[in-house]
Amino acid sequence: MRDGIFIVDGDGHVMDFSHRCYQKYLPEQYRHRIAFFPGAYWDRRQAPNGDMGRDPDTPEEMLADLGQEGIDLAFLYPTSALRIGEIREPEYQAALCRAYNDFMADWCKAAPDRLKGVAIVPYLDPTEAARELDRAVSRLGLVGLMFPTFIPGRNVAEPFLLADL
């Protein structure tokens, strides 16, 4: 809190690269494919006039950064998994979403009052997406949903996205 103002980061990001997330949480049958987003890992530490800084490797490092900036609460979104809409295989997409959501829930356990994770769901199977959202919120404690705004070859207003529950 700064000057009596509660500060919220409404667009925080966790670096969900393979060594932090998918090697541990993805089922064995998919681990050989963990470089699943082409070009998703980029060198973000270099800027034209110097270094940009370092991404936090742990929740504790993130909390230290938040403290330094005076941020009281952060809603956390994926980084690599922002590209979940590019995955075309329903089962693989569902496995990636479950792995990411498990990772995010564990990350937020370090300070559940300050770190609020946002889930991703496998939109290729709307019924599975509804199940995963329910699991992410009711069992894992995640607080929202990030849905891709671009689905290759589809319109996000199409009826195929309606779950059959």
What are these regions (language model features)?
Residues 1-165:
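Helix-coil boundary/capping segments in enzymes
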